[in-house]
């Protein structure tokens, strides 16, 4: 793989910057000969691995990981008519096995409800089997006809984490919805990705769900990116797939279900929100390497620099800080460029003067530089990593919230969504909501409990305390 050395386009041109960065930083190669299907570079995949291990650690507290087949028989996929209507024109079909036409066409999973729930029918017998909480991390396929974009809109989603739970009552399932939202909130906070949770409008909820809660973040161009969803399914799928349990009275009852998912869009959010004109800026929690140590050597006799670098690396690693030494035969400037492009949170420079002073030079990814004594170095670096993680989240959150504006007219909202999100009163009627979308040429993200207000619906004029968020979306 060739090492790129060119500079990136300005982030002000976000689309061009994003596409160039994915290749230059070796996150994802877009040159695979199928539209919307991309290849992870090893470095990009190391970020994916770190992020999804973090997600696994959160889920494994009270979920079990599993794996269901990718192929779904057509009759099973078509059982839930409302569900399949949501994406029937996006399904990939396998119609042949070798040269023989299959008696029953098989779908490549667009999502896994129709693969999982026939098995839940077999596995759930009594109230003692509940709650059942499973998840899997798999690839899914959608024949996207819109403009595809790596990590954001794909025909093969390579990293779809989907959890599926079953409960005795609707209220139990609702409690699980809130637990899932808490889990996702912790996950995105660890990624330093700010978000607002919206209850999707009725016409934009997950097909077959009672309601949908969505985690939305704002990309640098002001568009919203949906990075996670949590759905209360009620008994809709249980009735379709006959998933029942015997209660304490010996009577058969339908289970109530939830499902919730996150894809590699979470990594797109980290890249897009934090990156700069030098490359990636990774939160320490998401970076495979947290500190790179760079020896500064001026003569053939290194004056103990290499030995000092090795000592620092071992000291940091012994304290659970992921550090590496870059001892490649390159100028220090070339190494700075390389590790800045990779988004490494900190670099440590060690030269003869630092050894003499029993110190190291610590440089944060945003350029802040300070001399740090060797005494207590691991604790200092750990504190600096935490501080950087916190600063990234706070800066991103402040930037997002500063671009969410309450608007009084549709014309004002139309202007606002060019660079951010607009909020407006809404009566709650679908007809008014759709007219608002058409007038502003945007999407209604939904209602957020964190955004309060009151006013009159701009379409029908009714007084309301319901506030809707409007945005252009990926």
UniProtKB/Swiss-Prot annotation:
This is Proline--tRNA ligase. Its EC number is 6.1.1.15. InterPro entries: aa-tRNA-synt_IIb, aa-tRNA-synth_II, aa-tRNA-synth_II/BPL/LPL, Anticodon-bd, Anticodon-bd_dom_sf, Pro-tRNA-ligase_IIa, Pro-tRNA-ligase_IIa_arc-type, Pro-tRNA_ligase_II_C. Pfam families: HGTP_anticodon (PF03129), ProRS-C_1 (PF09180), tRNA-synt_2b (PF00587). It comes from the Archaea. Signal peptide: none annotated. PROSITE patterns: AA_TRNA_LIGASE_II. It catalyses: tRNA(Pro) + L-proline + ATP = L-prolyl-tRNA(Pro) + AMP + diphosphate. NCBIfam families: proS_fam_I. One of its GO terms (molecular function) is proline-tRNA ligase activity.
């Amino acid at each position: 793989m060739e090492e790129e050395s060119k500079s990136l386009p300005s982030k002000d041109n976000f689309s061009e910057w994003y596409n160039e960065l994915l290749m230059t930083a070796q996150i994802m190669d877009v040159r695979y000969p199928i539209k919307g299907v991309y290849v992870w570079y090893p470095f990009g995949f190391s970020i994916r691995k770190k992020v999804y291990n973090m997600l696994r650690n959160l889920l494994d507290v009270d979920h079990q990981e599993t794996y269901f087949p990718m192929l779904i028989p057509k009759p099973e996929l078509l059982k839930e008519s409302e569900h399949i209507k949501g994406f029937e024109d996006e399904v990939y079909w396998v119609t042949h096995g070798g040269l023989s036409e299959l008696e029953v066409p098989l779908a490549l999973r667009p999502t896994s409800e129709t693969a999982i729930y026939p098995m839940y029918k077999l596995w759930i017998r009594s109230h003692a089997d509940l709650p059942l909480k499973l998840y899997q991390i798999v690839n899914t396929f959608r024949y996207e006809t819109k403009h595809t974009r790596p990590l954001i809109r794909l025909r093969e989603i390579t990293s779809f984490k989907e959890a599926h739970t079953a409960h005795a009552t609707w209220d139990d399932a609702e409690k699980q919805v809130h637990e899932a939202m808490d889990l996702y909130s912790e996950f995105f906070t660890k990624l330093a990705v700010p978000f607002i949770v919206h209850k999707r409008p009725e016409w934009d909820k997950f097909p077959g769900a009672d309601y949908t809660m969505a985690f939305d973040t704002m990309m640098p161009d002001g568009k919203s990116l949906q990075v996670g969803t949590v759905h209360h399914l009620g008994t809709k799928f249980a009735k379709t797939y006959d998933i029942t349990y015997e209660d304490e009275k010996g009577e058969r009852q339908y289970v109530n279900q939830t499902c919730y998912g996150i894809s590699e869009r979470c990594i797109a959010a980290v890249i897009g929100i934090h990156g700069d004109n030098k490359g990636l800026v990774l939160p320490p929690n998401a970076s495979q390497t947290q500190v790179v140590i760079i020896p500064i050597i001026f003569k053939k006799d290194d004056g103990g620099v290499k030995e000092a670098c090795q000592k620092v690396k071992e000291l940091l690693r012994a304290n659970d800080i992921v550090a590496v030494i870059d001892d490649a035969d390159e100028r220090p400037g070339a190494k700075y460029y390389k590790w800045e492009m990779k988004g490494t949170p900190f670099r440590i420079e060690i030269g003869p003067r630092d050894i003499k002073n029993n110190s190291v030079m610590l440089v944060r990814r945003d350029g802040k530089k300070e001399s740090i004594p060797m005494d207590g170095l691991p604790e200092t670096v750990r504190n600096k990593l935490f501080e950087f993680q916190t600063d990234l989240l706070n800066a991103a959150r402040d930037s997002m919230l500063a671009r969410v504006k309450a608007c009084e007219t549709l014309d004002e909202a139309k202007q606002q969504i060019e660079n951010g999100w607009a909020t407006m009163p809404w009566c709650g009627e679908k007809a008014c909501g759709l007219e608002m979308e058409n007038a502003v040429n945007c999407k209604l993200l939904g209602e957020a409990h964190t955004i309060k207000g009151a006013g009159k619906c701009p379409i029908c004029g009714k007084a309301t305390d319901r506030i809707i968020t409007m945005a252009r979306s990926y």
